[in-house]
């Protein structure tokens, strides 16, 4: 049960050494004005102490220990100051010392190769002097010791089915390119970061890469403490099952009577310090016991953020991760050179399967812009012909028909064209998110947006439901294309969820090809300025209390209960490039005390969304309902610590462009196999030109990336925007058929479609690791490619886990200074 420090009680002890906040003195006075209200306090639902390193190995100490908070605050203060540095402290500048060293190394290698026949003894000595790295001999010795002790479990499990393809094998001693002390420090830090992510994923019942978990289990003193729930077993899918799931016998919104809903648990709900708590009685008082549901400890979260922030600017760790990423890129190029024709031959052997008829999911697309501009134009013209006299809008208390709305604009159906609609992004929207948002208004009129692409209006979202159903019909006709549409909940009023659910149920907006995500725009400052909200906690109550009520007593929100069965999770959206005037730390005001008109920072939104979602997931899992995941927009622009928060809390992210500047985070996202839905055409119009997009680089290194459309209304021209996205990417980056099918398979894996549906699309064994989990008859991805990805990931995980397991190095003294990039 959660314990809260009440009046007169001391606050829970902070797990790291207390230091004065650098922001308190370094940040501008106006950035802190009015935000000095009650600070954040520890709030924990699980009994007992919850230290950060609860299930870590005995020794994961590094040279950064004791300095994480100080280093993180320094980096936060740099981001607030908007430094004019040529490169950020977490990225590599263009003239990187590592690149210079690599060039020198290559020149020396060429010189040595020229002298090999003349002076073999000189060659040997030169190679030993130049390539000498402590990590080689130490790691080799460790391997020999491990074999001598009979510890063969990890190696035996890594034996995969032999696949007929050519592998690149580095013979001899392991070459990491860094001294062993740096290797061990980097390996410990990377492992510690992976443990942190695993902890938060388990806490919220989100997924974590099974391969990574298996390697981390070799290091943990004891298994991670998780809640287990009884689940009804899924009906197994046979190996010969059709690629199309069976059709539903009846519409999922058919029975909406409260009498058919699950029973009432009779539990009470109340939000305390920004998180909904569940009590054993309907009207809880101060002495009413709580239902024990776990959620993240706040002090522990801030400490974990500080650890990761300090990690990404550590010089030796950046060098290690940069080298590993470069190695992964080069290794993939060699793999393609050796096996491209074999992969193509394997694809050609599969009957009735090619890129067009494999499942692909648009994992990042907004419902309000899921149609293309021609589709919207035709729909508006059709509505003007058929429903001219329908009352669609209220202007200053006077009802208006569709005819009157267009007459007030001096427009007829004949006047309308794609150009007058003016919803497509152009060169004027680059780095201008405000102008891009204005493109959501057809003909520049917000009233048309309200009439045609809103769920809550005078006609109860009738037109929007019709156009969404037309898009769904197109997806069903294509058979193999699917989408996860984003619908908005703003948090301005408590009845938003019920209105949205009634819109979906009453208009029967459903398709087996579509799942929903709910996006929460980060617009508290706008609502607070207009006086619509008193504090940030009111916004959180409006977003989450209806969900808890529908879970505890489904009959009280029957439409919402049905609608939530088709919702995958939550998204956090807004312009990331907007400056943040506050840093989320222990001095930040609690949600009920956040009454200023400043917008809370990104991490603040994400933490409270995650904390409430974790509580909700455990409650829903107890009832046998499906759970939600967190899949925010992240890394499109703005500061790097957005990606740090998402690494800890999010199952997948959208965009992730800034990973190209942060080698440590990019390596962590690779090792954890975090899904990244990338939208190159969207980025090309807003933040990054197409040829600079890092998607092909991410794909070659093995990150879990997929292609998505984001906003077809603004960026695409054809009836099939997802195919348009694949087509342009293939032409510009010269992707192979295997690359395209791999992207499509990734999109299905990271999507929120049910396990049974994925079993039909990918094969009943898709959850298994490596080639055993691939069915080329359904995915058209050769086992060669899947085997290469799996073996490479295992080798990278083995490298860092073996280094941590090594006992050759004594404990690093805490007095050793860390190497940081130069400050401003």
UniProtKB/Swiss-Prot annotation:
EC code: 3.5.4.6
Keyword flag Zinc: yes
Binding annotation for substrate: 366, 435-440, 636, 711-714
Residues where Phosphotyrosine is found: 90
One Gene Ontology biological process: cyclic purine nucleotide metabolic process
InterPro entries referenced in this protein's UniProt entry, alphabetically: A/AMP_deam_AS, AMPD, Metal_Hydrolase
Residues with Phosphoserine modification: 21, 45, 63, 79, 96, 113, 135, 137
Quaternary state and interactors: Homotetramer.
Superkingdom, natural source: Eukaryota
Enzyme class, spelled out: hydrolase
Family that this chain belongs to: Belongs to the metallo-dependent hydrolases superfamily. Adenosine and AMP deaminases family.
Phosphothreonine modifications at: 133
Organism: Rattus norvegicus (Rat)
Catalytic residues as annotated in Swiss-Prot or TrEMBL: 655 (proton acceptor)
Region called Disordered, residue ranges: 1-43
UniProt-recorded name of the protein: AMP deaminase 2
Cofactor: record remark: Binds 1 zinc ion per subunit.
Reactions catalysed according to its record: AMP + H2O + H(+) = IMP + NH4(+)
């Amino acid at each position: 049960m959660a314990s809260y420090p009440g009046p007169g009680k001391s606050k829970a002890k902070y797990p790291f050494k207390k230091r004065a906040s650098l922001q308190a003195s370094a940040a501008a006075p106006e950035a802190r004005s009015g935000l000095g209200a009650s600070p954040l306090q520890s709030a924990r639902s699980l009994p007992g102490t919850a230290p950060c390193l609860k299930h870590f190995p005995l020794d994961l100490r590094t040279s950064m220990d004791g300095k994480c908070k100080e280093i993180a605050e320094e980096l936060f203060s740099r981001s607030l100051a908007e430094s004019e540095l040529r490169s950020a402290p977490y990225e590599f500048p263009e003239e990187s010392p590592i690149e210079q060293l690599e060039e020198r190394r290559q020149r020396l290698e060429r010189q040595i190769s020229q002298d090999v026949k003349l002076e073999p003894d000189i060659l040997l000595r030169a190679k030993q002097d130049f390539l000498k790295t402590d990590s080689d001999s130490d790691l080799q010795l460790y391997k020999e010791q491990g074999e001598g002790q009979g510890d063969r479990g990890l190696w035996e499990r890594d034996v995969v089915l032999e696949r007929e393809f050519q592998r690149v094998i580095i013979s001899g001693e392991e070459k990491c390119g860094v001294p062993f002390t740096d290797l061990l420090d980097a390996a410990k830090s990377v492992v510690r970061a992976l443990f942190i992510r695993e902890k938060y994923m388990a806490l919220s019942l989100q997924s974590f890469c099974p391969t990574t978990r298996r390697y981390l289990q070799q290091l943990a003193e004891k298994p991670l403490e998780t809640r287990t729930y009884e689940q009804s077993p899924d009906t197994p899918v046979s190996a010969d099952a059709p690629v199309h799931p069976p059709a539903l016998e009846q519409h999922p919104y058919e029975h909406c009577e409260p009498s058919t809903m699950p029973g009432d648990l009779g539990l009470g709900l109340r939000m305390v310090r920004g998180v909904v708590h569940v009590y054993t009685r309907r009207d809880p008082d101060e002495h009413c016991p709580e239902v024990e549901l776990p959620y993240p400890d706040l002090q522990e979260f801030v400490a974990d953020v500080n650890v990761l922030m300090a990690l990404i600017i550590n010089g030796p760790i950046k060098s290690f991760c940069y080298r590993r990423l470069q190695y992964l890129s080069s290794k993939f190029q060699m793999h393609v050179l050796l096996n491209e024709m074999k992969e193509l031959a394997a694809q050609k052997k599969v009957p009735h399967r090619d890129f067009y008829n494999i499942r692909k999911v648009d994992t990042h697309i907004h419902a309000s812009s899921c149609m293309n501009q021609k589709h919207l134009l035709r729909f508006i013209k059709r509505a003007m012909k058929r429903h001219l006299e329908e009352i669609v809008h209220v202007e200053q208390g006077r009802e208006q028909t569709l005819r009157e709305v267009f007459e007030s604009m001096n427009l007829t159906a004949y006047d309308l064209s794609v150009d007058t609609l003016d919803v497509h992004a152009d060169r004027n929207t680059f780095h201008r998110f405000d102008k891009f948002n204005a493109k959501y208004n057809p003909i520049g009129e917000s009233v048309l947006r309200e009439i045609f692409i809103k769920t809550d209006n005078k006609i109860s979202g009738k037109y929007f439901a019709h156009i969404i159903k037309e898009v769904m019909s197109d997806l069903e006709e294509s058979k193999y294309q699917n989408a996860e549409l984003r619908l908005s909940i703003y948090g301005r009023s408590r009845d938003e969820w019920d209105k949205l659910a009634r819109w979906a149920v009453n208009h029967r907006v459903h398709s087996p090809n579509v799942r929903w995500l709910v996006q929460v725009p980060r617009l508290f400052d706008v609502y607070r300025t207009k006086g619509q909200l008193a504090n940030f906690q009111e916004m959180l109550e409006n977003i989450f209390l209806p969900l808890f009520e529908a879970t505890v007593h489904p009959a009280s929100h029957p439409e919402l209960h049905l609608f939530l069965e088709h919702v995958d999770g939550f998204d956090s959206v807004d312009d990331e490039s907007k400056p943040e005037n506050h840093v989320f730390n222990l001095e930040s005001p609690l949600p009920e005390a956040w009454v200023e008109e400043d917008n809370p920072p990104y991490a603040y939104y994400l933490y409270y969304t995650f904390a409430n979602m974790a509580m909700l997931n455990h409650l829903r899992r107890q009832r046998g309902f499906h759970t939600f995941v967190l899949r925010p927009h992240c890394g499109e622009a703005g500061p790097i610590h957005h990606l740090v928060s998402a690494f800890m809390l999010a199952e997948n992210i959208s965009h992730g462009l800034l990973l190209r500047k942060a080698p440590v985070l990019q390596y962590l996202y690779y090792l954890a196999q975090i899904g990244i839905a990338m939208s190159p055409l969207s980025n090309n119009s807003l933040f990054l030109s197409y040829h600079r997009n890092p998607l092909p680089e991410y794909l070659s290194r093995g990150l879990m990336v997929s292609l998505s459309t984001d906003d077809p209304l603004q960026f695409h021209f054809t009836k099939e925007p997802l195919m348009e996205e694949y087509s342009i990417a293939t032409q510009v980056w010269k992707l192979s058929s295997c690359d395209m099918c791999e992207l499509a398979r990734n999109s299905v894996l990271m999507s929120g479609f049910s396990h049974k549906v994925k079993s039909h699309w990918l094969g009943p064994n898709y959850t298994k690791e490596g080639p055993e989990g691939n069915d080329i008859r359904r995915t058209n991805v050769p086992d060669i490619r899947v085997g290469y990805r799996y073996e490479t990931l295992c080798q990278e995980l083995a490298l860092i886990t073996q280094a941590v397991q090594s006992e050759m190095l004594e404990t690093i003294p805490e007095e050793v200074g860390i190497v940081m990039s130069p400050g401003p």
